[in-house]
């Protein structure tokens, strides 16, 4: 695993939750002795949905809802087996989606 990079992508609706999770991951990786790059904040995806308040008519009366998806990117350079084991045992809060990919340098 010496010439590989582990890329971790975090997604969540709450930015406080995602920042705390990224901090946990970075702290765990640094304890195992691997080099870490990040967290890099990626653009926030904002989805807006407009619905009518009334059932039949009154098209002028509308309501808008939005859902923001925050993303963070963490790269672990040359992860060791100890790093992979520590990350697999790490407990993350509900509401944080984690995607882990390994790639060659």
UniProtKB/Swiss-Prot annotation:
- Per its UniProt record, what Pfam families does this chain match? Ribosomal_S10
Q: Which HAMAP family does the protein's record reference?
A: Ribosomal_uS10 (MF_00508)
Q: Which domain of life is it from?
A: Bacteria
> GO molecular function of the protein, one example?
tRNA binding
Function according to Swiss-Prot or TrEMBL: Involved in the binding of tRNA to the ribosomes.
Concerning PROSITE patterns, the annotation shows:
RIBOSOMAL_S10 (PS00361)
Example GO biological process term?
Answer: translation
> What are the UniProt keywords, alphabetically?
Ribonucleoprotein, Ribosomal protein
Q: What is this protein called?
A: Small ribosomal subunit protein uS10
């Amino acid at each position: 695993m010496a010439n590989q990079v582990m890329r971790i992508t975090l997604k969540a609706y709450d930015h406080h939750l995602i920042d705390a999770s990224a901090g946990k991951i970075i702290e765990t990786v640094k304890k195992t002795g691997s080099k870490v790059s990040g967290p890099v904040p990626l653009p926030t995806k904002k989805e807006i949905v407009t619905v009518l308040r009334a059932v039949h008519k009154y098209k002028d009366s509308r309501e808008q809802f939005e859902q923001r998806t925050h993303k963070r990117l963490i790269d672990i350079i040359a992860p060791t087996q100890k790093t992979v084991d520590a990350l697999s045992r790490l407990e993350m809060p509900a509401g944080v989606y984690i995607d882990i990919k390994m790639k060659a340098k």
